[in-house]
Amino acid sequence: MVILVNFRLTSLEGIYQLVCQLEKTVFDQEAMYEVFQHAILNHSIFISKDNDRITGYLVLSITYQMHHCGKVAEVVELCVDNDFQNQKIGTDLLNHAMTYAKLQGCVNMDITTNQKRKDAHRFYRRNGLNNTHYKFTKQL
């Protein structure tokens, strides 16, 4: 059974494993811990669990944006364990985040995903999101 819970420090290792799985690399654990510390203080983090195993997580940022004349929620990260794909975990996390954002008074929700993640694009469309913007990046 999968349940949604708010982030706890005991969730760090499970989320670390999912981030490495998503990016197909092994990140430095100390550096990742520092990133976690920042995320904990500045974002809302929701996780899904099956017994004690973390099956997915979502990081949500809420900011005031002048061009929306209000608060906007942004899904900074959404990841579901490969072993738990196609079980509605991503949909549950996304719906939970949308409900939370509405309760916080957000007027919009934004999500950015890499162009190569075609499955993610289909997922977001199925869940009612529209592809309306371009995002430009430059590695520093």
Language-model segments: what does each one mean?
Residues F27-I45:
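Active-site rim helix/loop that mediates acceptor-substrate recognition in acyltransferases
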Residues V2, D52-Y57, A73:
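Glycine-rich phosphate/pyrophosphate-binding loop shared by adenosine-nucleotide-utilizing enzymes
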Residues T91, Q115-H133, K138:
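Conserved active-site alpha-helix within GNAT-family acetyltransferase domains
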Residues E77-V80, N86-T99, R126:
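Conserved acetyl-CoA-binding loop-helix of GNAT-fold acetyltransferases
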Residues M1-I15:
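A short beta-loop-alpha structural element at the N-terminal edge
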Residues Y16-E30:
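Helix-loop element at the rim of GNAT/NAT acetyltransferase active sites that forms part
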Residues L94, A101-T112:
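Conserved GNAT acetyl-CoA-binding A-motif
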Residues I47, R53-I62, C79:
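Conserved beta-strand in the GNAT
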